[in-house]
């Protein structure tokens, strides 16, 4: 048994812990209530929260207050327009390590908002600096450009894009440092001038977007690469559009798209502002002018010829000529970036194409300007057409943008017109007769169905009348009526049901039909007969049928068993005890040996009997002759033993000589064949000498 644990009893409310007596008898321990445990947990959590607040507010061990590490975010146009300043969160959910000191070269140390930096940002935003005004004006002018690039997925010079995101959105602190503002304004100016997107690696996960700002040296190197690749990109854009879109419809479709995307006043203002800002950047202009001159040499041929054809005969313009002309204007070495263009670039393609087209129109003083202006005016007039045509133009442009030239499919061999159907041949006389017969049968059936419908209508009306008349019987006295008697015969005919009359008519007609057998039709069909004039072959005709009278079962009688009856001396137990002489003992042993030999002989004979019945009879005679001397010897010995000592012997009825002289007769009995197990048992008993002697059944009889 486990010993009981002594425990303190529960005290009452008024008692103290010291007054409670120690019990002599052990009791169960007191269980604490769940409410007390919950109260302890609440008190502990409140203490921990207070300690956390103290650590955050006063710092840990005299160090600076804990500030979450944040990275700067790309400044968007909407934030510049609204001039929003986002403060850092007051208290993070989990305390973090104190921020390491960083050098002045990195932009992260400048842009991260700490305790002092947040105040500086507020002061800078309150007092609008001239640099900030320029920045906001530039962003307002390029609102549409920033809207198209809100995804902030920026290209790396190698042509790849890296996008990562963090969990929480970070506030963008702008206006606090003039160096950062200058860099941002330079990048925006480059965007307006038609350069690539700002060279910043955006790191974006599913929830948050941050940027890794680079040093000035890296930025200068990347800017040079982008400027060198700028003209090649414009060439690739122009050539790709010239490959897919016909030159006659190029300007019209671009004008329609710009009209749909942006209103005409806004588009003009944006283009004028962008051109004004490009004039300020002299370095970019020098590079562009050199590249544009090379473009002008290749483009005029592709613009002049199809434009004239389109104005004069737009419907008869063949597709093959335009494709050949476009191939001439293509550059031999397109840039790699035109091949691996992202979907964002494909969306911005119409804007860049419009800008490049405007620049070419101003600087190229060739007669192509007149044709392009006329087509642009026509496109503005056609912009008011229904939306179905615009959608068709878009679908055509999308198909051509994929690089598939739209050509009308003209089959080599057109199908011939089918002639009139062949006139059917006249049917034979038998078919015509069969068709007439079917037609007559159908007409007869149709007439019968109409007659039955008329008869049924009359029957319904007559049934209603007869029921009404039967209900009125006895109410009105008529001539010839007797109270309690049947109605007169004239009335009875009228009051009869039509069904009864119809049944009477059918019964009379059936009687007449049965009386005269001539009215019945012979419905029997002729017997199906085979072809005549052919005979069976002689082999089949001369065959004789074999009649088997016997069933095929035969009865055979044979002897399966044989019984041989022999007399034998049986000794009782008392007699054996009395006669213990050696002579008698030897004689009994000799007799047993002789009996065993005889049994073996009999077994051999039984095995040979199964072969042939004749051999069995011969062997039986031999055995009888051989057994006679043996039996005589036995009789002599028995007489000697009887003369020597009196022995009680159970002898069957009749003398021994009669029994011995009688030959075994052949008897057939209906005995079941013993099983193999029984045979083995009998053999074992015979060998051991335990089998009953052959004289015992005679004693029983």
UniProtKB/Swiss-Prot annotation:
Name a single GO cellular component: actin cortical patch
Looking at the record, which segments are called Disordered? Answer: 1-35, 53-177, 203-546, 589-701
Keywords assigned by UniProt?
Cytoplasm, Cytoskeleton
Q: Where is the composition biased (Polar residues)?
A: 237-247, 347-359, 504-519, 652-670
Domain of life from the UniProt record: Eukaryota
Compositional bias annotation for Basic and acidic residues: 203-236, 266-294, 306-319, 375-397, 404-414, 445-455, 494-503, 619-642, 676-688
The principal location of this protein is cytoplasm
Q: Which family does the entry's similarity section mention?
A: Belongs to the AIM21 family.
Q: What is the protein named? A: Altered inheritance of mitochondria protein 21
């Amino acid at each position: 048994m486990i010993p009981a644990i002594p425990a303190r009893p529960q005290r009452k409310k008024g008692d103290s812990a010291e007054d409670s007596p120690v019990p002599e008898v052990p009791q169960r321990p007191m269980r604490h209530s769940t409410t007390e445990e919950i109260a302890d947990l609440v008190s502990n959590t409140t203490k921990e929260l207070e300690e956390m607040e103290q650590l955050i507010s006063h710092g840990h061990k005299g160090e600076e207050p804990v500030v979450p590490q944040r990275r700067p975010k790309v400044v968007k146009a909407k934030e510049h327009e609204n001039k929003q300043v986002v403060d850092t969160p007051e208290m993070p959910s989990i305390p973090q390590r104190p921020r390491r000191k960083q050098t002045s070269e990195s932009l992260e140390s400048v842009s991260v908002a700490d305790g002092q930096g947040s105040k500086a940002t507020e002061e800078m935003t309150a007092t609008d600096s001239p640099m900030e005004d320029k920045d906001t004006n530039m962003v307002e002018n390029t609102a549409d450009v920033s809207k198209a690039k809100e995804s902030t997925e920026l290209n790396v010079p190698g042509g790849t894009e890296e996008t990562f995101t963090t969990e929480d959105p970070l506030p963008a602190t702008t206006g606090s440092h003039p160096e950062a503002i200058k860099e941002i304004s330079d990048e925006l100016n480059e965007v307006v001038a038609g350069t690539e997107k700002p060279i910043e690696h955006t790191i974006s996960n599913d929830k948050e977007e941050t940027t890794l700002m680079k040093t000035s040296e890296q930025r200068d190197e990347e800017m040079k690469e982008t400027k060198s690749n700028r003209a090649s990109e414009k060439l690739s854009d122009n050539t790709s559009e010239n490959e897919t879109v016909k030159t006659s419809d190029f300007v019209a479709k671009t004008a329609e798209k710009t009209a749909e995307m942006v209103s005409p006043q806004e588009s003009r203002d944006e283009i004028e502002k962008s051109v004004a800002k490009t004039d300020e950047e002299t370095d970019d202009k020098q590079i562009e002018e050199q590249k544009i001159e090379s473009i002008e040499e290749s483009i005029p041929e592709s613009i002049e010829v199809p434009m004239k054809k389109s104005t004069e005969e737009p419907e008869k313009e063949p597709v093959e000529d335009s494709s050949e002309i476009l191939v001439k204007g293509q550059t031999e070495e397109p840039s790699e970036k035109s091949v691996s263009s992202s979907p964002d670039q494909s969306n911005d393609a119409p804007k860049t194409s419009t800008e490049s087209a405007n620049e070419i129109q101003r600087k190229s003083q060739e007669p192509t300007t007149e044709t392009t202006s006329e087509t642009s005016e026509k496109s503005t007039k056609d912009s008011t057409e229904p939306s179905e045509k615009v959608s068709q133009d878009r679908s055509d442009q999308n198909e051509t943008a994929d690089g598939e030239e739209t050509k009308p499919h003209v089959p080599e061999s057109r199908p011939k017109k089918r002639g009139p159907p062949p006139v059917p041949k006249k049917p034979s006389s038998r078919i015509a007769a069969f068709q007439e017969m079917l037609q007559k049968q159908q007409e007869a059936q149709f007439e019968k169905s109409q007659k039955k419908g008329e008869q049924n209508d009359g029957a319904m009306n007559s049934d209603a009348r007869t029921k009404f008349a039967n209900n009125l019987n006895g109410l009105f006295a008529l001539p010839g009526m007797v109270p309690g008697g049947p109605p007169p015969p004239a009335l009875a005919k009228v009051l009869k049901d039509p069904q009864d009359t119809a049944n009477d008519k059918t019964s009379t007609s059936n009687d007449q039909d049965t009386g005269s057998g001539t009215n019945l039709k012979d419905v029997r069909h002729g017997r199906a007969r085979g072809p005549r004039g052919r005979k069976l072959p002689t082999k089949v005709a001369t065959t004789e049928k074999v009649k088997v009278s016997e069933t095929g079962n035969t009865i055979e009688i044979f002897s399966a068993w044989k019984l041989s009856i022999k007399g034998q001396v049986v000794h009782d137990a008392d007699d054996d005890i009395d006669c213990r002489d050696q002579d008698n003992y030897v004689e009994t042993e000799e007799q047993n040996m002789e009996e065993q030999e005889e049994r073996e002989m009999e077994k051999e004979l039984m095995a040979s009997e199964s072969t042939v019945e004749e051999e069995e009879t011969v062997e039986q005679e031999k055995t009888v002759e051989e057994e006679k001397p043996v039996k005589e010897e036995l009789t002599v010995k028995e007489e000697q033993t009887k003369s020597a000592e009196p022995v009680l012997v159970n002898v069957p009825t009749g003398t021994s000589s009669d029994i011995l002289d009688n030959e075994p007769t052949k008897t057939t009995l209906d005995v079941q064949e013993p099983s193999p197990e029984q045979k083995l048992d009998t053999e074992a008993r015979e060998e051991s000498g335990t089998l009953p002697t052959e004289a015992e059944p005679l004693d029983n009889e």
